[in-house]
Amino acid sequence: MFPCTDGLKYKGYLFPPINFLEGIQTTYPRMVSQKKYTKLGSLKDYQDLLERLKKIPSMISQIIDLLKQGMREGVTYPRESLNGVDDQFEKLQGDVEDSPFYVRFRDMPGSLGRHVVSRIKTEAFNITENEILPAFRRLQEFIKYEYSSALRSPPGVSSIPDGAEFYQATLSWHLGTDLSPQEVKLDIKHPLFYLLTSSFTHRFKILASRRWKPSRKKQKLLSRRWDSI
């Protein structure tokens, strides 16, 4: 077994979620706005969601602090990881009425109580307009005007301090084995491929079973960007 705490020394926390696949600018709006991720039925459900939304600006401030620390220590994202991220942030800056952070409150049923619904809707609108969207704008501009200058050109993690050790630790965590990267070949015909993908999230299992075909060249697989994820 490999406890999570064993990996703290490799400072993976200096890669907070801002990349084009799993950024706070995409996962949180989707989680809040889509009913399949956040089910709202009772008044308490809406109140709880509102309390969670209030914490987003603080979370974004923490992300900026971690990115700044990463810049100081030479642990930053590769340039490719942030392709299209600015556009993702920009999509959030629109009419508050249609904001993914507000739409669930906009559509609150009056049956929950006219006065309390009005109060919660007003509070959610104000928080979205005055706190959440400005916080996302602040992170967007920090990435665009400051962090982007520190992005590393080599995409491999070996280009960061102790990167080879970081890679080995990540491999050991996902595979549950001490095999070196040289010993593990990511071949879709190899049983270890399925062991590796099974330790990732569900979407990677789907990609492995439906979209990674044996006829595809490995280099093409590694360089391809899955915009549909």
Which residues fall in each region the model found?
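N-terminal maturation segment of proteins
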Residues: 1-229
